[in-house]
Regions:
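C-terminal ends of transmembrane alpha-helices
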Residues: 144-152, 208-214
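Short amphipathic alpha-helical coiled-coil/interface segments
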Residues: 196-206
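An acidic-aromatic substrate-binding cleft motif
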Residues: 1-55, 59
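N-terminal leader/propeptide and maturation segments of large enzyme subunits in energy/redox metabolism
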Residues: 1-10, 180-195
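Short beta-alpha connecting loops at secondary-structure transitions
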Residues: 156-164
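Single conserved hydrophobic/aromatic residue that forms the stacking wall/gate
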Residues: 223-234
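Aromatic-rich carbohydrate-recognition surfaces in CAZymes
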Residues: 29, 40-150, 165-185, 196
């Protein structure tokens, strides 16, 4: 028997799926607010670092969830790999005139891995793979230019601020994205040597530099780093 509090918590969250927070445009592609009030939507654009946390839709309606990945990587991503973390409505190419969100963009790579596993279709993975690689390369070049396996440069995130210096929170996204990408690439028989080396460095940094024995921490750094907008805007 499931405890009544658990039932209430699950039901209360799943009702969002039938609210105006979530809808589909004319061609079936999903587009979401972050939430909604009685007369308005709150924070537009299927925000990547907010929808990182949603796990119901990919398991209940995986085809619909995949349209979010296809929008993020095929439509809202620039040729240089910069990904807008809010997509336009109607869904269409967007101006890349704001920071990329480190947690949103890296989280999207892990979500591709998840969605591929749920779908079980290698053709879909092959279709999106080069876009995912382009996205990850942008993240590496922008936030880990020294190839240390750590998100070190100032980076925008879900708190609508820039983190200055490595943190357990954002670096876990980086580690996870590297691990997901290595797994996908190896499945497709790609040479993943460079990315696996970065993954090993990232795991080592997480365990030995960002864990104090009790908590994962942030190593605040305000010197010897680039100004955040210079790399995040194109």
């Amino acid at each position: 028997v499931i405890d009544v509090l658990v039932v209430e918590a699950v039901a209360a969250n799943l009702t969002i799926l039938k609210s105006p927070t979530i809808f589909r445009q004319y061609d079936g592609r999903m587009w979401n607010w972050e939430g909604c009030g009685n007369e308005y939507g709150s924070c537009y654009g299927s925000c990547t670092h907010v929808w990182n946390y949603a796990q119901a839709i990919p398991h209940l309606f995986p085809k619909m969830e995949r349209t979010l990945r296809e929008t993020e990587f095929f439509v809202s991503q620039a040729k240089n790999g910069h990904q807008a973390f809010r997509s336009a409505l109607p869904i269409r190419p967007i101006r890349h005139n704001f920071h990329a969100a480190a947690d949103g963009q890296l989280g999207g790579i892990m979500k591709v891995y998840r969605d591929w596993h749920i779908y079980g279709n290698d053709e879909w993975l092959k279709l999106i793979y080069s876009y995912v690689q382009n996205s990850l390369d942008y993240c590496i070049n922008t936030w880990d230019p020294k190839r240390k396996g750590v998100i070190e440069e100032p980076h925008h995130n879900t708190y609508d601020i820039e983190f200055w210096g490595p943190s357990g929170m954002i670096n876990s996204y980086y580690t996870g994205a590297l691990q997901a990408f290595v797994a996908m690439g190896e499945h497709l028989e790609k040479d993943m040597t460079e990315y696996r080396e970065l993954l090993d460095k990232s795991i080592d940094y997480m365990e030995n530099q960002l864990y104090d024995g009790e908590y994962f921490i942030q190593n605040l750094s305000l010197i010897h780093i680039s100004e955040p907008t210079r790399h995040s805007l194109i």
